[in-house]
């Protein structure tokens, strides 16, 4: 809601469309992420992170695959993982500079941090199962969005797409940990 208001009221250009787009994408991503977190808590029998890590080995491998998929899509939407990336560049281009900096510099990193702290230690078998499709999506971030970035004529859209492309490199480094 705050992002919607900051972009929708204080933004420039096609700010209303960008505000709606970011709200819908991040809202749907949050719902998917919430489903994964609730399933993870039910699989471990607790919402306490310390107990959850201790019980992570008892999660059924089939459940790990499903939970990992939900966490990848949920956190991937926040990080603007390809193909859930189309909200980022228009939002950054329409947002006031401080709002764009907040999203690109801080909020996207929450998605990566969530993967590092939750997905990797709690559902490692599920992440291993999804590693190849994840690498294909990461290549989409790096190659496709890189091509879109190079072809941009507007600097604000170029910077927005560049941020998305660089998240692919960071996500790729995290995938190397799996």
Where are these regions (language model features)?
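Membrane-interface helix-loop-helix modules in multi-pass inner-membrane proteins
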Residues: 1-6, 75
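Small-residue-rich segments of transmembrane alpha-helices in multi-pass membrane proteins
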Residues: 2-4, 23-37, 97-98, 102-113, ...
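C-terminal ends of transmembrane helices
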Residues: 5-14, 79-93, 142-162
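Membrane-helix interfacial "entry" motifs
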Residues: 14-19, 93-97, 101, 124, ...
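Juxtamembrane/interfacial segments at transmembrane-helix boundaries in multi-pass membrane proteins
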Residues: 15, 21, 30-86, 90, ...
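Short beta-alpha junctions and helix-cap segments that line functional grooves
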Residues: 19-20, 146
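Short hydrophobic "helix-edge" motifs at membrane interfaces and signal-peptide entry regions
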Residues: 67-69, 98-99, 143-144, 156
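Transmembrane alpha-helical segments of multi-pass small-molecule transport proteins
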Residues: 69, 133-149
């Amino acid at each position: 809601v705050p992002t919607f208001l900051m972009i929708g009221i204080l933004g420039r250009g096609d700010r209303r469309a960008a505000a709606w787009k970011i709200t819908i994408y991040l809202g749907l991503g949050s719902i998917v992420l919430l489903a994964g977190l609730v399933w993870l808590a039910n699989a471990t029998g607790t919402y306490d992170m310390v107990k959850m890590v201790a019980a992570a080995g008892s999660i059924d491998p089939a459940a790990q695959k499903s939970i990992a998929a939900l966490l990848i899509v949920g956190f991937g939407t926040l990080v603007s993982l390809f193909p859930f990336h189309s909200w980022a560049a228009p939002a950054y281009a329409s947002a006031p500079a401080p709002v764009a900096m907040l999203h690109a510099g801080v909020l996207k990193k929450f998605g990566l941090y969530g993967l590092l702290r939750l997905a990797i230690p709690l559902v490692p078998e599920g992440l291993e199962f999804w590693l190849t499709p994840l690498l294909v999506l990461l290549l989409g971030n790096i190659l496709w969005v890189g091509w879109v970035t190079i072809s941009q004529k507007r600097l604000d859209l170029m910077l927005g797409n560049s941020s998305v492309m660089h998240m692919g490199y960071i996500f790729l480094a995290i995938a190397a940990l799996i």
